[in-house]
Amino acid sequence: MRKVAIYGKGGIGKSTTTQNTVAGLAEMGKKIMVIGCDPKADSTRLLLGGLQQKTVLDTLREEGEEVELEDIIKDGYRNTRCTESGGPEPGVGCAGRGIITSVNLLEQLGAFDDEWDLDYVFYDVLGDVVCGGFAMPIRDGKAEEIYIVCSGEMMAMYAANNICKGILKYADTGGVRLGGLICNSRNVDNERQMIEELAKKIGTQMIHFVPRNNFVQRAEINRKTVIEYDPTHEQADEYRALAQKINDNKMFVIPKPLEIEELEALLIEFGIAN
């Protein structure tokens, strides 16, 4: 079973990219579990046809310790197993702590047991690695390969570099490795070349360049992944290509994060800071 975590700046399109990629893998016949590690609980919505499923933390609050696996896992597109960790009430408690509670509960209830015959577990993790709780999939060895969703925008690249610092910190203890950068295009000038160069400097690869296409939003409005909404669309093939590249990937590295000056020099070189 491969344990994958998707990180990236808030709003970069992590959940959309994760769900569309998972749909591509499911189409290949892979058995997958998706764990949403975001208080917004929107990491599985497209796989479930828009169903806002009850989160692990909400279920725990309402039912106490009497929680069964079927209470917190729903079957989505092509039998993907979907669960959302959820978060505390706004202004109360720690969302990162909630992720730890949720994943530990899933383990206790046997969500990852051999009987499920899983090929992949995907963790869709909120935003930047800003606290220990959100770093938990990296830190505790829950995830073994990380993909960072980014774009040619400065803050997305800054966040990607920060996440690499988190991976570096826990690479020895958790055994986690970086599998590559996924460029979710924002149509920035020289974007593909810039992210390829960033990947090279960090010591990794740009595993796929996902072109910007408004059809993704159209599929989302219809509460579906692109592959489910229109399997013949060119954007569906982009996500299939990304899924295939992740499935075939053999390049797993300990990243070499850049200094902020190096990052700014890269932005200047490709004309974005001019």
Curated annotation (Swiss-Prot):
It is an enzyme of class 1 (oxidoreductase). [4Fe-4S] cluster binds at residues 94, 131. The reversible ADP-ribosylation of Arg-97 inactivates the nitrogenase reductase and regulates nitrogenase activity. The modification ADP-ribosylarginine is found at residue 97. Binds 1 [4Fe-4S] cluster per dimer. GO terms for molecular function: 4 iron, 4 sulfur cluster binding; ATP binding; metal ion binding; nitrogenase activity. GO terms for biological process: nitrogen fixation. ATP binds at residues 8-15. Its EC number is 1.18.6.1. Pfam families: Fer4_NifH. The keyword 4Fe-4S applies. Gene3D superfamilies: P-loop containing nucleotide triphosphate hydrolases (3.40.50.300). Keywords: 4Fe-4S, ADP-ribosylation, ATP-binding, Iron, Iron-sulfur, Metal-binding, Nitrogen fixation, Nucleotide-binding, Oxidoreductase. Its cofactor is [4Fe-4S] cluster. InterPro entries: NifH/chlL_CS, NifH/frxC, Nitrogenase_Fe_NifH, P-loop_NTPase. Belongs to the NifH/BchL/ChlL family. The key enzymatic reactions in nitrogen fixation are catalyzed by the nitrogenase complex, which has 2 components: the iron protein and the molybdenum-iron protein. NCBIfam families: nifH. This is Nitrogenase iron protein. It comes from Pelodictyon phaeoclathratiforme (strain DSM 5477 / BU-1).
